[in-house]
Amino acid sequence: QRINSVYNPEDLIERKIAVEQGSGAASALMGYKGGLLRNQVSIFKDGIEAAKQVLTGAFDAAFVSRAQAEAAIFERKDNPTPWALSSLTLPGVMPNGWPLGLAVKADNKELATALDNALTTLRERGELLRLFKSHGLTLAAP
C-alpha cells in the first residue's frame, strides 16, 4: 500500500524505509524514540540509491534530502507516476536542510566578492534556476 504523505515518524511504523549510509538523518531516524523504527531501516550507499528503492517499489519510504529524491525521480523519465515528497522533522536533523556555501580564505576578499557577484548574476538571469530544473531539482532560497 502506497503512502500518500508522512507527517511524523509514527506514520512509518511497519513500513520499509531506505536511508543513506553515514547520514545524520539515518542516525536520527534509527535512534528516534529509542529505536522505534530501527528494524525497518535499510542502508544504501547514497541518498539517490535509497530514493530509487521507493521508485522501484522495493521500499515504502526513503528518508533523504529533497535534492536526492528529486534526482532519483528525474532519472526515471520513463515512469510518469507522480511521487509525493513530504518534509519530516526529527530531533537532530536540520528542518530546512543543511546550509551550503562557498568557502574562501578570509584574506581573499576579492575572490569572495567575485564569486558572490557571479552567483547573484546567475540567479538574476534565471540561469541558476534553469540549471536546477535541467537536473529535475527545486531551487530553494536559503
Locate predicted features.
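Proline/Glycine/Serine-rich low-complexity intrinsically disordered segments
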Residues: 1-142
